């Protein structure tokens, strides 16, 4: 397998084509963004940490029967993945109130949400990822009703698997986002799962162990990411 041309450069990852039309190389960079990409900084080791973290989580989800785009780890910062036709809508599962939900509804941060909330957002930085629903998806043709139902089912299944994984490590999985795509007609989990796209709190102290440390200028971003990785069993070095 040979890495070829750059296909897409996102806020924290770069995607490359390969000599296999069905496979891509995903490179995790040290960039960290907030405010829909308006604020970007670099942190040493972040690309490596997120790459290995994501590979670990995707492997756990695959073991649980959730189809993922993951093929294999290539290097400290690169992974080989299936080329998906991405759905332009992201799924968010919320176990506790935080972030935009608190701002939108004026509820207390940390409120337990039982059953968990399932939200949909259109992936559009210029419009600040507006919240949408199943009706929008059907009307605008973003994803079929059947595929959307599958995305919801897989998101909630991932929540069960990961909530237990983090709980066993002394962490609360507050919320997280997932992105899906189609591979040969099948819904497959793509993009990444890392502390960049999830909220993780320490069970005892409620300390934030995710990208909110960057968003809220709390400091210690990489130290928090590495601590979460260590607790769940990710081998970094």
UniProtKB/Swiss-Prot annotation:
Its EC number is 6.3.2.6. GO terms for cellular component: cytosol. It is an enzyme of class 6 (ligase). GO terms for biological process: 'de novo' IMP biosynthetic process; cobalamin biosynthetic process. Disulfide bonds: none annotated. It catalyses: 5-amino-1-(5-phospho-D-ribosyl)imidazole-4-carboxylate + L-aspartate + ATP = (2S)-2-[5-amino-1-(5-phospho-beta-D-ribosyl)imidazole-4-carboxamido]succinate + ADP + phosphate + 2 H(+). This is Phosphoribosylaminoimidazole-succinocarboxamide synthase. The lineage of its organism: Bacteria, Pseudomonadati, Pseudomonadota, Gammaproteobacteria, Enterobacterales.
